[in-house]
Each structure stands twice: as C-alpha cells, then as structure tokens.
Amino acid sequence: MILVKDAIINGKKQDLLVEGNIIKKIGNISISEVSKDETEIIDGKNCVLIPGLVNTHTHVPMSLFRGVADDIPLMEWLSGHIWPMESKLNEKIVYAGTLLGTVEMIKSGTTAFNDMYFFLDSIIKAVDETGIRSTIAYGMIDLFDEEKREKELKTARKSLETIKNLNNSRITGALGPHAPYTCSKELLESTNTLAREYNVPIHIHMNETLDEINQVVEKTGMRPFEYLNSFGFFNDVNTICAHCVHLSDSEIQIMKEKNIFAAHNPVSNLKLASGVSPVLKLLENNVPVTLGTDGCGSNNNMNLFEEIKAAALIHKGVNLNPVAVTAKEAFEFATLNGAKALNINSGEIKEGKLADFVIINMKKPYLTPKENIESHLVYSFNGVVDTVVIDGKIVLNDGKMVTIDEEKVYELAEEAYLELTK
C-alpha cells in the first residue's frame, strides 16, 4: 500500500491511500489505519498531487533523433533525414531509444503513452522495465504494394498476439497504419477488421499537412476523412487521429459522428510549420481533444506540460480570443481526455481509479503563490516532477528513477546514437 499524507488533492489538503493498483480512499486518513510495515508513506506537505499525464501520440524510440534535423519542411524532413536514419534501426537502438524516452516522460509527469513505431519487442521490453503504461502499435506502411501489405499486416497481427500473451495490464496493443497517403485501401480495410477482431484502437496520422491532403484528393477525389469513411474505416472501432491540422467542416462532422479522438500536437505542428489544428471548432462540435508530443525528431522533447501550455496559448492567439482553450480545458486534454482515448481508468483523482498520479513540490518560485496552482501547472510549470506512481507502484521518487539505472540509460542512448549516425 501507499499512503500520501497532507498533499493538495483536488483543491484541498487531504490524504490518499493506494491499495494494489487502485486509489482506495481520499480524505483524512490516520497512519494508525494502515500497517506501517506494509505501507510506503509519502509526505505530501507543500506538494500537489495530480493525475498522471497521457501522451496520445508519439514515437518514443525517436528520442535518439533529437536535434538531428531541425528547421526543415515535413516532407523533406521525412524523406531526406528521418526515413534514411530509420532504415538503420535495429532492436538494440530501439530499446535504448525507448528507455530514454520513457525516462523523459516519467520525469515530466507522463504515466501513459500511445506509440506507433517498429521493433515492438524492444519497445515492450523497455516499457516493462521502466514501469510506464503504454498502448503500442506497429507502424504499418505498404506504399500501395501488395507484397509489402501482406508483410505489414502479418507483423501487426504478430505484435497484437505478443502483447495479448503478456497478460500485463500496463501494456496494451493497437493498430497503427501510418496515414492515408502511405497506406493502401486494402491495408486500411484490413486494419479495421483486425481492430474489431482484437478489440484494440486504431492510431493513425491524419491531415497533418496540405501536401498529404492534396495527394489523397488527387488519388481518390475525396479529403482524407471522407475517403476513409467511404469504406467504413472508422466503423465500430476506437480511433485516435494524430495532428488533424487542416480539417473541413464535413471532416469535423465525420469525427463527431464516429466518436473519433483528435490527438493535438501543437509543438510539433508549429516546428514543422504544418499549421494549427482548429481545436475550437473541434470543441464546438464535441470532438474530444487529447495531447501528444509526437517524436523527439520534431518536438524536440517529450514534456507534455509544454504541450498543455502551447495548447492553452496558441488558440487564444490565432482566434484573437483570450478565453479560447482555458487552462482547465488544456489540462484535461492531457489527463482525462487522454485516459478516455486509451480506455484507461485514470485521468482524474478519484476513489476507484487506477493509481496513476504525480506529486509535485510547490516550493518553487514558478509555483508560488500556491493559491493559484491550477494556473501555474498550465502557464508556468516546467515539468520537473518529484514523485510518480504508476499502476500502484512508485517509479520515480524524489526526482530519481526507482525502476531502472538512469546512468545506464544515458550510456546506452549515447552508444545507440553513434551506431545510428555512423
């Protein structure tokens, strides 16, 4: 068990008891109510306890791509830099990159993430060791080639079976067709079939740039969401669509009707000059918005607090509206909405919820005065957290990783980077 004493929880000073992996009780809890020998007691004085953040779109192993190709347009960035480097990937490199990325996320308050990438056995191994929660998809790209398509679908099915057989509630599977402009109709149709067979979500890039939208329109005569909807891609599945930058009104209606989650990646979209997602229109149409960092190659970090701040600021600026995307809304994008998108029983601090939470020491200049903590967490916090609990286990204590040797992670990452760039 874990007992957190005297922390600010849901706006007031109280205690929190974890039993197993569940928040058992919130309120005034005496130490005499628990067994001292079986309970880890955390002093929450001068601290705020918040839900763990949920990163709904990323490519975690790309933590090794940090800073390698800055200030370049998306298509040139992909074809001239990222894809050539990815051709050198192997299990060892992906393992090292995933370790580095998960440590970065945990140390900045993220307790769960939604990933699409390659070498999934290496990702699973790193996730298992660090203790983070994850939904993992193999990134499928067939480039309209039948032989490649069959290979990609076979790999995706094998990955789902591997994750299913883990019997690890922290690690779940998803299907990750890259995007409509890189995947054939046949692959996309098979994706929906597999998602329903395995009861897993679909994670896909949608409408990130004008160029890719034009490619789909030229090929099909329809915009991407219209095209996918025409053959039932969104039917009877939970779909998380990353980016959603350039959307028509009809596409937003499809998102609303099909209960699609938008994974908003404001920093990545700004860095690659892709544009700004019409989040206000999405909210007006009751389309749920979540937050993602994207990969470090286009961000260049995995600090979701930066995405929260960016989401709260950019829509005020582009809409000339100071109340567009409030601090509360932006925070919920990264907590409650993200948890709903990944079907995780978390995202808020309530009895009966999973014990995925973060403790932050408020004795910091940027978190003072403490009376305005909700504002501070969105507009002034730098993301450096003190304690992280995931699935009822302490994985970060006093800013230090508990589950793995952090120095070894940095050593492996440097070695992997040298191999990747030689």
UniProtKB/Swiss-Prot annotation:
<dbReference type="InterPro" id="IPR011059">
    <property type="entry name" value="Metal-dep_hydrolase_composite"/>
</dbReference>
<dbReference type="InterPro" id="IPR032466">
    <property type="entry name" value="Metal_Hydrolase"/>
</dbReference>
<feature type="binding site">
    <location>
        <position position="178"/>
    </location>
    <ligand>
        <name>substrate</name>
    </ligand>
</feature>
<comment type="function">
    <text>Catalyzes the deamination of three SAM-derived enzymatic products, namely 5'-deoxyadenosine, S-adenosyl-L-homocysteine, and 5'-methylthioadenosine, to produce the inosine analogs. Can also deaminate adenosine. The preferred substrate for this enzyme is 5'-deoxyadenosine, but all these substrates are efficiently deaminated. Likely functions in a S-adenosyl-L-methionine (SAM) recycling pathway from S-adenosyl-L-homocysteine (SAH) produced from SAM-dependent methylation reactions.</text>
</comment>
<comment type="similarity">
    <text>Belongs to the metallo-dependent hydrolases superfamily. MTA/SAH deaminase family.</text>
</comment>
<feature type="binding site">
    <location>
        <position position="205"/>
    </location>
    <ligand>
        <name>Zn(2+)</name>
    </ligand>
</feature>
<dbReference type="GO" id="GO:0050270">
    <property type="term" value="F:S-adenosylhomocysteine deaminase activity"/>
</dbReference>
<feature type="binding site">
    <location>
        <position position="294"/>
    </location>
    <ligand>
        <name>Zn(2+)</name>
    </ligand>
</feature>
<comment type="subunit">
    <text>Homotetramer.</text>
</comment>
<feature type="binding site">
    <location>
        <position position="57"/>
    </location>
    <ligand>
        <name>Zn(2+)</name>
    </ligand>
</feature>
<dbReference type="GO" id="GO:0090613">
    <property type="term" value="F:5'-deoxyadenosine deaminase activity"/>
</dbReference>
<feature type="binding site">
    <location>
        <position position="208"/>
    </location>
    <ligand>
        <name>substrate</name>
    </ligand>
</feature>
<protein>
    <recommendedName>
        <fullName>5'-deoxyadenosine deaminase</fullName>
        <ecNumber>3.5.4.41</ecNumber>
        <ecNumber>3.5.4.31</ecNumber>
        <ecNumber>3.5.4.4</ecNumber>
        <ecNumber>3.5.4.28</ecNumber>
    </recommendedName>
</protein>
<comment type="pathway">
    <text>Amino-acid biosynthesis; S-adenosyl-L-methionine biosynthesis.</text>
</comment>
<dbReference type="InterPro" id="IPR023512">
    <property type="entry name" value="Deaminase_MtaD/DadD"/>
</dbReference>
<dbReference type="InterPro" id="IPR050287">
    <property type="entry name" value="MTA/SAH_deaminase"/>
</dbReference>
<dbReference type="GO" id="GO:0006556">
    <property type="term" value="P:S-adenosylmethionine biosynthetic process"/>
</dbReference>
<keyword id="KW-0378">Hydrolase</keyword>
<dbReference type="GO" id="GO:0046872">
    <property type="term" value="F:metal ion binding"/>
</dbReference>
<keyword id="KW-0862">Zinc</keyword>
<dbReference type="InterPro" id="IPR006680">
    <property type="entry name" value="Amidohydro-rel"/>
</dbReference>
<feature type="binding site">
    <location>
        <position position="59"/>
    </location>
    <ligand>
        <name>Zn(2+)</name>
    </ligand>
</feature>
<dbReference type="GO" id="GO:0090614">
    <property type="term" value="F:5'-methylthioadenosine deaminase activity"/>
</dbReference>
<feature type="binding site">
    <location>
        <position position="294"/>
    </location>
    <ligand>
        <name>substrate</name>
    </ligand>
</feature>
<keyword id="KW-0479">Metal-binding</keyword>
<feature type="binding site">
    <location>
        <position position="86"/>
    </location>
    <ligand>
        <name>substrate</name>
    </ligand>
</feature>
<dbReference type="GO" id="GO:0004000">
    <property type="term" value="F:adenosine deaminase activity"/>
</dbReference>
<dbReference type="Pfam" id="PF01979">
    <property type="entry name" value="Amidohydro_1"/>
</dbReference>
